[in-house]
Structure formats: C-alpha cells, structure tokens
Amino acid sequence: LIEKSKRIVDLAKDLETDVITTHIGVVPNDPSHPRYAIMQDACGQLAAYADSMQAHFAVETGPEIATTLKGFLDGLHSKGVSVNLDPANFVMVTGDDPVQAVYTLKDYIVHTHAKDGKRLHYVSPEILYGMEESDMLNDASFIELPLGEGDVDFPAYFKALNDIGYKGFLTIEREVGDDPEGDIRKAADYIRSLI
C-alpha cells in the first residue's frame, strides 16, 4: 500500500495538485498500542515521500479526537501527512468540538470539509471504522444532515479557520439524503451567507 500511495502522489502532482485526501484508520489513544507504531512507520514513509514531492497526504478527521491526531502527527516531524478537517466527523463520531479542533490542528490543516450531522448515540470509533466487529453497525449511531441542520457551529467554525489564517479549499461534502445535489446548492448559499 505504501508504494501504491506514492504512485498516487505522483499522479496528483501530474494533475497539478498537491493535496491527496485519505483515511488512515483509527489512531489509538495510547501510543504504546501496537497499531500506533505500525501507523507511525507507514505514515512516516508517506510523509517523507510527500515532502520530497512538495505534497500532502491529508488525513480526514473523525476516528480520533483532535489532540490524539495532533500527537500522532507531531511524532512524524513532517507536514507531508497533514489534515483534511471534517467538522461533522468530530460531532458524529467522537463528540469532539470541531471549532477547538481547528485551533488544535492549525499547523496541519491543508484541506477542509463543510459537512454537518448529529450523533444519535456513542459507538466506539474502533467499531465504526471496522477495527472491531460488532452488531452495533446495524444501528445508526449518527446522521449526516444538510449544512446548518446539524450540530456543527458553522459561524464559529469559519471564524476559527479565519483566525488561524486558513486560505485553502472548503469542500462541501454530502454523501446521503434524498437530494444531495439540491443540498449542495443550499449549502453553498448557506456558506455564502456566513462568510
């Protein structure tokens, strides 16, 4: 997978972009967990390659709280693996505050999502992201909603991005719903009304 990921960086550069968004799985809260070292090694190799190509693997937030992800990224000593901040994933999965996450992860944010949702009840990220088997996946633990209808405080989120000087992309993400295209249009109007 590491070599395949390097080829994806090559392709991205050929397409004249320097950000590749991805999921890496669940970073364990405990750095002594065996998976932590494996993830550090793999991401360290990818970070070094991305750095050499002046590119970024942007890890999408969600499976862990911001402080855990920051500690993991700090251990790489590189910006080659950075952050695609998805505020709804914090709300829906970990219950972490996406506004505070902007400040915590400010040195690593290279891409962001505009997505909204609500957590219905807690399910371990280890289960949600397939690290552990469970029947709980059959029971919806969160719901993605049109922008402005969930629990993400978008005025505060946009203020935080502005506070840290973020000037990159803000990608509207809508994966579900009866009218995703209509929801995306409404989301664009909603964002314009706030910025």
Predicted regions and their residues:
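Histidine-acidic metal/acid-base catalytic patches
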Residues: 16-18, 44, 52, 66-195
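Active-site acidic/histidine proton-transfer and metal-coordination neighborhood
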Residues: 1-83, 92
